[in-house]
Structure formats: C-alpha cells, structure tokens
Curated annotation (Swiss-Prot):
One of its GO terms (biological process) is positive gravitropism. This is Phototropic-responsive NPH3 family protein NPY5. Component of a complex made of PINs (e.g. PIN1 and PIN2), MAB4/MELs (e.g. NPY1/MAB4 and NPY5/MEL1) and AGC kinases (e.g. D6PK and PID) at the plasma membrane. Binds directly to D6PK, PID, PIN1 and PIN2. The gene is NPY5. Residues 214-465 form the NPH3 domain. GO terms for cellular component: apical plasma membrane; cell periphery; cytoplasm; cytosol; plasma membrane. It comes from Arabidopsis thaliana (Mouse-ear cress). Keywords: Cell membrane, Cytoplasm, Membrane, Phosphoprotein, Ubl conjugation pathway.
Length: 580
C-alpha cells in the first residue's frame, strides 16, 4: 500500500478521556475547536496560517452563525463549534497536525477524508504555498491512483464521504483509474491482483502463467453494490472487455455478496430488503448477449431471486428457460414443480419449430427425469398429477435410454405405496420398456412395485435382446407373440388379471440361461442353447398370453406390426395419457 508522510515534528497531541484532545506545549492554548462530541484545545497561529475557513471563524467577533459554525468567548479562549466536517474528528486532527508541522501519515484509507476536510477548511495554495490540498492532490495523482488495489480501497472510502467526494470528483477519478486497468491488454498487467481460480499448467510444466482475462473480477467484489454498478458501467463503456468477462465478474460478485448463493440449500437471511436490492441489481447488470453468463449462474441467481422476492424474476426466468438444456440437476433441485414446468414451457417456446434440436431436447429430458426422481422423495409436494404433468411435457423428447424415466417412476412408486393399479398404469405409460438398459431391465424384472403387465413386457424385450445378441443365425429370432408395451385399449380389468407366477419364474429362468450361455463363450453350444432358449421363452409367452387376448394387446409376427415397430404403441400411449 502506498503512503505519504507529512511534517517532521513529533506528534504531541494528547488525550484526556475519549472526548478531549490537546497539544502538549509550554504555550497555553487559545482556541477550542469542537468537532462533534470531541473538543480540541489548540493554538490559533498554526491554524490561521494554513486554513482560510478558520481565519474567518476566529477573527469574527460576532456570534452570528456562518454555515452552522458558532463562535463564543470563554475564559480568554475562542470556542468554535463546527457542526459538520467531512471525516469527523479524525480527519480534522490530520489537518490540525499538518498545521503544526507534526508527522502525519496518509494512505489509501484516510486520504479521501483528509482531502475532503482540507477542502472544507480551505487549505489552499492561496493561503500558503505547499498547503495540504496541493500535497494530497500530488499524492493521489502520482501514487494512489496509479495503484490497482489502492484505487479500489480509496473508491470504497468515497461512499461514506459523499457528497464531498463527488463534488471533488474523487469517486469519478477512482472509477476511471480502475476501468483503465481492467480494460488494459493482459500482457501489460504487472501489478498484483487476487485470483483464486486454479491455474492450469502448460503441458504439465511449471511456466509463468499468462494473466487471465478476468484477473480483476475478484478484487472488485469488496465494493458496495452502488459503486460496483458504476465500476462495471465505466469498464463496459471503454469497450475493451468482452461480455463473458463481465458475466464472470457478476458471478464472482454474487457468490461473495449473496448469502448461500453457491449452496444447495436455503440459508437464513435477516435483511431481505438489502439482499433483494442486491440481487435485482445483479440481474440488471447481466449483458444482453446470450452466452455472457453460464447457465449454472443463471439457475442459482433465479433460485436466490425467488427466495428473496426480487422484482426481476420474470425476465430471469425466461433466460434460464431458454438455456434449460445447459442446466445442472443440482442447480434446479430447489425449484418447485410449477417453476420447472414454466421453465420447460419457456424452453419449448424458444425452440425454432423448423429445427429439430435433438441434443438440446435430450439434455432437457435427462434433466427432468433426474429432477422427478429426486423430487419423488418429497411425497408431500409431488402428487401424481404434478409428476405426470411435468413428465408428459418431455415425454416426446429423444432419449438414448429410458433408464432415467424408469428411475423416476420407481422412486415415485416407492414413496407412494398407496397408489392403486390404475394410477400405477398411468405412470408406467411414460416408460418405453424397449429402451431400458440391461441393468435397468434386471432391476425391473425383480421390482415388485411395478404392475405385473410391465414386468412381463420388460421380460419379453429383455429376452428379445438376449436372443438377438446371442443367436448365430442371421434370421429373425424374435418370438411370434409380442405383448404391446403401451396399449390404447387396456382396461382396469386387465390389471386385475391373475398372472401365473410359475410362468413369470419360467421367463426369468430362461433369461438367466441365455445370459449364462453368452458368458460361456462356447459358440457351438451357445448357439444351440440360445436358439432353444428363445423358443422356450416364446412358448412361455404364448402360454402366458393365451386366453387373455384383447384388442391391441397382441402383435403377431404376421400382423401389421413387427418387433421393431412398436412406435405405434408409443403414439397410442401419448393419446391415452391425454385422457387422464
């Protein structure tokens, strides 16, 4: 930190209690200056030689008030009461010591107060050459404002000294100094700065690191929001800093200034009005460029803004929804279901209908699946209808697998054991059994929470997969009878049908044999077993479904649908779900 020492005489100011200051001298004091609740017992001559304002006050023989300063004669001492002086007693003492020629040290923390007080006391060059105003200006221009961190400290102090600091343009000069350095080419940054992000090493070797583009953002986080807004506006006005760096600055500021911003749970806030205004200001400062801030930052800011009751929530909600495909599950878990639905709606509206953005939709589908799985643990706040409403919004979105859908359904069934068969049927329509991974299938076939019809479907498609993967023939090894995964004509009566437990066990046994044969890696015997297993499973399925045929419940290999075209069932599922 830069500093400047003024004067050479030893400091002879003494204290008597908390409210009395005097100069230890052989000469009796002849003037009392009252600043606030502190009395200074001083000598006229040193003060008169450097302060035009004190000259006027002391030489005035009347008791008239001049800008709320009054003079009284008291025991051969003039008593001057100064109602207000920038910086209070501390800054006046600096000026008084300068008048006496005593040693006083100026630095970034007290220089603005001293400058404002010197201006108030009219300590100009016209009164005496080399006066305090001149010396402080030299110190500011040649030292303080040439230092990155000192400029920030000084800017902080200007707020408590407004409007004096504004009238003397001290605030503006600090802002210009900060903006000029933040906007400079990073290759010319030679001063120290705070940067806590991990710096990558080039090729694993320890080399001098290039200065990052956002090197300045953390140092500005200590600024009050009013000054921070002005600093950012001044930096942006120079046009040399990109929008994404401004976004990084806002992110760093939010993390430091908004309680619990980066935490996964709400925190207790005592001053809602303060932090509400802070969050609103940050939202207003976000650049218009879409990628100027990360999606994670937006989702966290939306969460905080809703919690604080901010005014700018609507606009922020749109920005989050438009980029919902970039959101992380951890960032949205504190959102309620209604908010998630509105974000998905914004996402859908923001998509160009002429473009099929498969990747973005798949990301949103994965996000919603994970959200529903986690939210299902909170059974009180996620009833079936809300679950279905949100899930159906993304039911048509592309997915590589339906494992996420299955996990969400299973978690919901686990937390809602009171569900009846009709409700279970509705929720299970969201899942396409053909798109479950082998691991999900293995879990599903043992899952007693699923309706038996769904278990049968999973068993069947798992058998088809195992049969096709393991068969040595190039022909169609799909069984002749396929139960529809999503039938439009199923009824509650079907759910009450008594499935033969022995048949289900037989299916599971056949599948176990298929897996075992595959793992043995004996192609000749494996081929025989796989073929035999496939036929065995087909016979079990035929037995299982015989006598229970319904319209749309069976698809024959010679019918209109084939094992690879169960998409028709998916479409009918969509129309069915709308009926509920």
């Amino acid at each position: 930190m830069k500093f400047m020492k003024l004067g050479s005489k030893p400091d002879s100011f003494q204290s008597e209690g908390d409210n009395v200051r005097y100069v230890s001298s052989e000469l009796a004091t002849d003037v009392i200056v009252i600043i606030g609740d502190v009395k200074f017992y001083l000598h006229k001559f040193p003060l008169l030689s450097k302060s035009a304002r004190l000259q006027k006050l002391i030489t005035t023989s009347t008791s008239s008030s001049n800008e709320e300063n009054q003079i009284h004669h008291h025991h051969h001492e003039d008593e001057i009461e100064i109602a207000e002086i920038p910086g209070g007693p501390a800054s006046f003492e600096i000026c008084a010591k300068f008048c006496y020629g005593m040693t006083v040290t100026l630095n970034a923390y007290n220089v603005v107060a001293a400058r404002c007080a010197a201006e108030f006391l009219e300590m100009y060059e016209t009164v005496e050459k080399g006066n305090l105003v001149y010396k402080i200006e030299v110190f500011l221009n040649s030292s303080i404002l040439q230092s990155w961190k000192d400029s920030i400290i000084v800017l902080q102090t200007t707020r408590a000294l407004s409007p004096y600091s504004e009238e003397l343009k001290l605030t503006g000069r600090c802002l210009d100094s900060i903006a000029s350095r933040a906007s400079i080419d990073t290759s010319k940054v030679e001063w120290s700065y705070t940067y806590s992000k991990k710096k990558n090493l080039d090729n694993g070797l320890r080399k001098p690191q290039a200065v990052p583009r956002d090197w300045w953002v953390e140092d500005l986080c200590d600024l009050h929001i009013d000054l921070y807004k002005r600093a950012l506006a001044t930096i942006e006005a120079r046009g040399n800093v990109s929008a994404d760096v401004i976004g990084e600055a806002l992110h760093a500021y939010a993390i430091k200034r908004i309680p619990g911003f980066s935490k996964s749970s709400s925190v207790q806030v005592t001053d809602f009005a303060k932090y509400r205004a802070l969050a609103d200001s940050i939202i207003e400062l976000i650049p218009d460029e879409k990628r100027s801030v990360s999606s994670s930052f937006l989702t966290k800011l939306l969460r905080a803004s809703i919690f604080l009751g901010c005014d700018e929530v609507a606009g922020l909600k749109n920005r989050v929804g438009e980029r919902l495909d970039e959101a992380n599950l951890g960032d949205v878990l504190l959102y309620d279901v209604e908010l998630m639905q509105s974000l998905v709606e914004v996402f859908l509206k923001s998509r160009d209908p002429r473009e099929d953005d498969v990747t973005a939709k798949a990301s949103v589908a994965k996000l919603v699946d994970g959200y529903l799985a986690e939210k299902s643990r909170d059974s009180d706040n996620l009833p079936l209808q809300k679950f279905l409403s949100l899930a159906e919004m993304v039911s048509s979105f592309p997915r590589q697998s339906h494992d996420g859908v299955y996990r969400a359904i299973d978690m919901f069934l686990k937390e809602h054991p009171e569900m009846n068969k009709s409700e279970k049927k509705r929720i299970c329509r969201l899942m396409d059994c053909r798109k479950l991974s082998a691991e999900a299938c293995a879990h599903a076939v043992q899952n007693e929470r699923l309706p038996m019809r769904v278990v049968v479907q999973v068993l069947f498609f798992e058998q088809v997969r195992a049969n096709n993967n393991g068969s040595s023939s190039t022909g169609n090894s799909t069984p002749e009878v396929i139960p529809a995964s999503r039938s439009t004509n199923t009824t509650d009566q079907e759910d009450t049908e008594c499935w033969d437990t022995e048949d289900i066990k037989a299916l599971r046994g056949e599948l176990a044999n298929l897996r075992l044969a595959k793992n043995q890696q004996e192609s000749h015997n494996q081929g025989k077993l796989m073929k035999g297993g496939g036929l065995g499973v087909s016979r079990v399925f035929s037995k299982l479904w015989s006598g229970k045929e319904r319209s749309g419940d069976m698809i024959s290999s010679s019918g209109t649908s084939s094992p690879g075209s169960v998409n028709d069932d998916s479409k009918s599922s969509s129309s069915t779900s709308k009926k509920h």
